[in-house]
């Protein structure tokens, strides 16, 4: 095909509704004989699945759209620089440091993303482990991991890009019956269910108190960026300084805030499921939040120079920095 499309759709009463269609960044391969690289890749993955690890779970799977969904953000065949930037700024360390700082399990020595023949994949085992509570008993983690993986294998099309919202328990909202139903399906005991509910409830409460801290950190990062741009440092020095600022004051607080946003949506959904608010009220509330796209549309109506100063760095694929913007 000349190009590939990412199509998001839903099916309601046998009627298909198209939500979004976008072109995927796919680089045509110059390799004509795929036998050797595919055989080498098979050996590599088999070796990886047999490696011992301190993580819970023996079964290991990889997905292009789980969690930080690289297939959408980077494309199916991103350039090496785009892949390495994404790893440097997010999937090598930052993502796991974020989870740890919020009270989740320590998986900081484990990278989240691997590149297989140029296609980025998320390590599902590492990802699931990162949503366990840091002091959750190991026997409970084992049961949950086996349950999550079984559900993922049975319906990968349903979970591959939304495990944090549709598969793994990572917070507790107002609708506790929802989680109890899931945990009963996983065949956990009443005692184990109580432990899980208590620990994730405490984690959820603690998340709320870390909101301002991360907003302030993000804002301070913007101040540092302006300072670096005005400095007399060489371009090489600026590159390294900008990398550190982007990691510590950009993607790290962003990862924390994104996690909090997921939890906030979970609470909104629970308010609706408990019939405290209607779907219409939930939608209206969400519409009051000024999204990035809303702010961009407002900025477009003003000065072109100011718009470019704020959004001029954007391009169809953020991490393909060699692509003209």
Task: Please describe what each predicted stretch is.
Residues 1-325:
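Conserved divalent-metal-coordinating catalytic cores
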């Amino acid at each position: 095909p000349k190009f590939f499309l990412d199509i998001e759709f839903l099916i309601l009463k046998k009627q298909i509704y198209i939500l979004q269609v976008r072109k995927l960044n796919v680089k045509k391969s110059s390799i004509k004989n795929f036998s050797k690289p595919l055989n080498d890749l098979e050996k590599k993955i088999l070796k990886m699945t047999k490696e011992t690890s301190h993580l819970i779970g023996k079964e290991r799977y990889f997905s292009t759209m789980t969690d930080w969904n690289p297939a959408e953000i980077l494309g199916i065949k991103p350039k090496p620089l785009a892949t390495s930037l994404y790893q440097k700024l997010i999937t090598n360390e930052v993502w796991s440091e974020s989870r740890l700082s919020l009270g989740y399990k320590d998986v900081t020595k484990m990278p989240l993303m691997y590149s297989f023949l140029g296609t980025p994949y998320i390590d599902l085992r590492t990802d699931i482990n990162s949503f366990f509570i840091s002091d959750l008993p190991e026997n409970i983690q084992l049961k949950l991991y086996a349950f999550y993986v079984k559900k993922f294998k049975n319906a990968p099309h349903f979970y591959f890009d939304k495990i944090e919202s549709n598969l793994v328990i990572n917070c507790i909202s107002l609708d506790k019956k929802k989680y109890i139903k899931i945990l009963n399906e996983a065949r956990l005991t009443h005692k184990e269910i109580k432990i899980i509910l208590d620990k994730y409830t405490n984690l959820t409460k603690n998340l709320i108190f870390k909101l301002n801290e991360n907003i302030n950190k993000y804002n301070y990062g913007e101040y540092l960026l302006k300072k670096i741009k005005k400095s007399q440092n060489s371009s090489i020095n600026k590159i390294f300084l900008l990398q550190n600022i982007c990691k510590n004051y950009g993607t790290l607080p962003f990862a924390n805030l994104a996690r909090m946003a997921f939890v906030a949506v979970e609470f909104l959904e629970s308010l609706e499921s408990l019939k405290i608010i209607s779907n219409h009220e939930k939608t209206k509330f969400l519409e009051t939040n000024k999204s990035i796209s809303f702010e961009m549309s407002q900025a477009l109506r003003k000065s072109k120079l100011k718009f470019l100063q704020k959004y001029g760095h954007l391009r169809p694929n953020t991490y393909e920095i060699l692509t003209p913007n």
